[in-house]
């Protein structure tokens, strides 16, 4: 899930105490569903070739909040494509284990050993408050489905004293009432990954967990302490009733559904990164904030978009006869130096596909019975997966290769072996921990007490790594995403996931 974007922090700002009364307008995310398909907002772009491939901008929120507003041609493009790529492989157990490892302090170290005493005590006090409030924050529907407060708290904050400070900061920002209430329903990108797997599509990822994780771990200690302190200040102000959050997940959903997300982002900063430098900060803290801003812009936006774009290009050239559906955080397609810009510089024609425009079918394929939109995408009642104390089985069976070498129907080429996707075993035991338990939603973090630009995108990543035939966790890495896909604060991170049923998220 990111971030995973994987993970971008939501920029929140500290406002005068009197402004707090404005908090929590519940109807802000509501948007009237347009009667005509052509009136819906579209986050679909077509890569013009035969067969065509597509970019689709996702958002890291429960899919049920946005699904009815996604145009039919976007859903049809998903069905028509034989290969679906995400920022990260949200269904691969390796993603979970890699996230866990990335977030942990070196062996033998604990937070109490590395944090200043006053910050550690404030952090511990805040987590005790959250644990106390968790039963009150949960909805009757969540409790009715067997989700318990203690389980949920431990799934999110378990072993927090062993985590690196930067990940604790992100964790704190995912332990809010709004986020807790949203758990139990897959976020949009995870839902698409589950559907792709259910439909036996070949899937892959353009990024690896490490690519989203390492940039965050690359911040120096003083920068991380600055960010964690600002985060705790914000949460303490929220508890005291003196803080108003100007942009929330509800606002993000409204902008995504109603079609003004781009204008919101671009009106703040065309580069998608918030100018989170607060003029009220002391001079030295302003310098620290500027350093973080510069580092995150470079590592999490510009370098990432360039890397993802080149990996997409490599896939398109490797398999010219295959139709791809690339589902990345919508923030990757907005502003300057986007993934779209990278592909266009490489000579590809990429155009926006408005809602209501028919999808080009491309080369004729063997006739086969294909599910309809109504049967595939009928929203289902989400089921909560309760982890059992058993480990994931490492075995799996593989699907037949979807890519055939010209002139050889039996012998798979080396390229074919790269893109085989494992099929999840139907009898696999439940996982001990879930993807959402490990990713932290960056979208709603706020490191600097000042509102910045909302940025959608929740995942980040690194090197090109392709699985070999028979590779157990089969993490096909040719790029990645998350999605971190929400808002961006001083501390841009990944939104592949640590929040909803599986952000960052």
From Swiss-Prot:
Residues 389-428 are annotated as: Disordered. It is a single-pass type I membrane protein. The chain crosses the membrane at residues 478-498. The keyword Transmembrane helix applies. It is an enzyme of class 3 (hydrolase). Divalent metal cations. Mn(2+) or Co(2+). The keyword Membrane applies. It comes from the Eukaryota. GO terms for biological process: head development; negative regulation of Wnt signaling pathway; positive regulation of protein-containing complex assembly; proteolysis; Wnt signaling pathway. GO terms for cellular component: membrane; organelle membrane; plasma membrane. Residues 499-505 are cytoplasmic. Its EC number is 3.4.-.-. Residues 1-19 form the signal peptide. GO terms for molecular function: endopeptidase activity; metal ion binding; metalloendopeptidase activity; Wnt-protein binding. Residues 20-477 are extracellular. Residues 419-428 have a biased composition (Basic residues). Its cofactor is Mn(2+); Co(2+). Metalloprotease that acts as a negative regulator of the Wnt signaling pathway by mediating the cleavage of the 8 N-terminal residues of a subset of Wnt proteins. Following cleavage, Wnt proteins become oxidized and form large disulfide-bond oligomers, leading to their inactivation. Able to cleave WNT3A, WNT5, but not WNT11. Required for head formation. Was named TIKI in reference to large-headed humanoid in Polynesian mythology. Belongs to the TIKI family. This is Metalloprotease TIKI1. The gene is TRABD2A.
